[in-house]
């Protein structure tokens, strides 16, 4: 079927002229546009990259679904940092070449097209909208995706984008709100697309990490966080795959995560999609 033309101008292109003008001002400009990391990549990552370059098959084609070590690392990351046991909720994960391409292709990977509707926040990452238009589907913007009444009765809604912590507002969607969104999406047969690339940048997570290191055996029930928000997670931002949110099943939920923000690795193009086993396995097949 191919890509459809998209009508929304890319935001970074729209502000290019303003950036050029700002750069001529004495002192330069403070660039808050793309959000490219300004701090260096952690030395541990650099060392691992060097070691990986010397691996016996570093020059060969990679495994599409990820190596056994990568799969194990993803499982551990979700379990220890997001409070999610992927296997227990029948979820799978697949690595992607950065998250931007995954976002842009998501509507197409879900076989959406003319007549289908994708809901997204009115103010959000521009690639949500462009990706929907590339698939030929219709974009519907709502002021607040947590207000399920604003979209649940719209005909032909097939997917809902959420972003928590949200860019640019910083708002964190609570576990209760996530539960409502997931339940409403399931009632209408839509997929929840949860962009969680800022999940570990919630400042409240610092307190959680400190508490966990001083009392590693502490249970969720002993913490000051609501029980519905954790299972236990070192991130204070609830995950859409949290068993309390998804009622023990990843069906109809896809979480996108990237190391670009968390580890200053935007140039490394390292990300993943995790969630609904059937959907993720299908996407892994496409990548082959």
Residue ranges and their predicted role:
Residues 2-98:
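N-terminal small-domain helix-loop-helix segment of the aminotransferase-like
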Residues 38-43, 168-171, 200-202, 264-266:
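Short catalytic/ligand-binding loop motif for oxyanion handling, primarily in non-cytosolic enzymes
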Residues 58-184, 199-213, 219, 229-248, ...:
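Conserved core of the PLP fold type I
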Residues 192-193:
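Residue-level marker for buried hydrophobic side chains located in beta-strands
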Residues 196:
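Walker B catalytic acidic pair
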Residues 213-222, 226-228, 242-288:
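Conserved core segment of the aminotransferase class I/II
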């Amino acid at each position: 079927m191919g890509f459809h033309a998209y009508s929304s101008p890319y935001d970074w292109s729209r502000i290019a002229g303003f950036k050029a003008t700002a750069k001529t001002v004495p002192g330069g400009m403070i660039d808050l546009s793309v959000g490219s990391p300004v701090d260096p990549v952690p030395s541990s990552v650099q060392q691992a990259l060097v070691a990986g370059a010397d691996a016996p098959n570093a020059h060969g084609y990679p495994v599409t679904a990820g190596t056994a070590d990568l799969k194990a690392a993803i499982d551990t990351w979700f379990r220890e940092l997001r409070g999610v046991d992927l296997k227990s909720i029948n979820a799978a994960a697949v690595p992607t070449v950065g998250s931007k391409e995954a976002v842009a292709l998501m509507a197409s990977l879900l076989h959406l097209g003319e007549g289908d509707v994708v809901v997204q926040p009115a103010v959000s990452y521009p690639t949500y909208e462009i990706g929907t238009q590339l698939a030929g589907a219709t974009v519907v913007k709502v002021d607040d995706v947590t207000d399920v009444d604003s979209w649940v009765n719209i005909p032909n809604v097939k997917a809902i984008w959420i972003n928590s912590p949200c860019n640019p507002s910083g708002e964190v969607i609570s576990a209760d709100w996530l539960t409502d969104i997931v339940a409403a999406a399931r009632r209408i047969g839509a997929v929840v697309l949860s962009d969680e690339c800022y999940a570990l940048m919630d400042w409240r997570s610092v307190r959680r990490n400190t508490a966990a290191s001083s009392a590693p055996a502490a249970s969720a029930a002993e913490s000051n966080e609501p029980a519905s928000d954790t299972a236990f997670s070192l991130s204070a931002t609830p995950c859409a795959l949290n068993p309390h949110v998804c009622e023990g099943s990843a069906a109809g939920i896809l979480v996108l995560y990237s190391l670009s923000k968390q580890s200053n690795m935007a140039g490394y193009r390292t990300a993943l999609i995790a969630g609904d086993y059937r959907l993720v396995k299908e996407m892994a097949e496409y990548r082959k």
